[in-house]
């Protein structure tokens, strides 16, 4: 593995452990060139469906886009990076279980919102406001009123009530 500090190609593994509910292996490495340490994550290569955008374009599934969108919605909320990663991993598993070659962005967005609503209601509303592109305050208010009708398993006040 190439060292991110000096570019040297040889290293040794100092520590290795399971990460992300067994979905990845976290390895702590030490460069044999500069002796600095860095962390890598190894995960199974998964075959994910192609994403069909609203305009009909198709592109490969990009986990990073979902992580970034959820992280933006969770800014200044009591939601950890690990919780965000777990949420996105759950969405990926759900998509894989469908067994489809292609999936529409709508289905991905709905899967994210379903999990985000259980994790943190404020982050859910933030994500929904961008994802659903409300045309007016009335649509936004309808969504907020829907939060009053709790889903089974949702936490009162989201995670903000810790």
Curated annotation (Swiss-Prot):
Statement: the UniProt record of this protein carries the keyword ATP-binding: yes
Keyword tRNA processing: no
Cofactor dependency: Zn(2+)
Keywords linked to the UniProt accession: ATP-binding, DNA-binding, Metal-binding, Nucleotide-binding, Repressor, Transcription, Transcription regulation, Zinc, Zinc-finger
Zinc finger (unnamed): 3-34
Cofactor note: Binds 1 zinc ion.
Superkingdom of the organism of origin: Bacteria
Record-level GO BP terms: negative regulation of DNA-templated transcription
Domain ATP-cone residues, every copy: 49-139
GO molecular function ontology, one term from the record: zinc ion binding
Matching Pfam families: ATP-cone, Zn_ribbon_NrdR
NCBIfam families to which the protein is assigned, alphabetical: transcriptional regulator NrdR (TIGR00244)
Function statement: Negatively regulates transcription of bacterial ribonucleotide reductase nrd genes and operons by binding to NrdR-boxes.
Family: Belongs to the NrdR family.
UniProt name for this protein: Transcriptional repressor NrdR
Gene: nrdR
């Amino acid at each position: 593995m190439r060292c991110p500090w000096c570019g040297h190609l040889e290293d040794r593994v100092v520590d290795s452990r399971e990460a992300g509910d067994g979905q990845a292996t976290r390895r702590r490495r030490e460069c044999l060139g500069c002796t600095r340490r860095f962390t890598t994550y190894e995960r199974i290569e998964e075959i994910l469906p192609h994403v069909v955008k609203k305009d009909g374009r198709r592109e490969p599934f990009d986990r990073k886009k979902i992580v970034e969108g959820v992280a933006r919605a969770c800014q200044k909320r009591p939601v950890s990076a690990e919780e965000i990663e777990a949420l996105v991993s759950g969405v990926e598993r759900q998509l894989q279980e469908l067994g489809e070659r292609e999936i529409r962005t709508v289905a991905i967005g709905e899967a994210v919102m379903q999990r985000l609503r259980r994790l943190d209601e404020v982050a859910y509303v933030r994500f929904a406001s961008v994802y659903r592109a409300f045309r007016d305050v009335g649509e936004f208010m309808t969504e907020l009123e829907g939060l009053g009708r709790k889903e089974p398993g949702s936490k009162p006040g989201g995670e903000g009530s810790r």
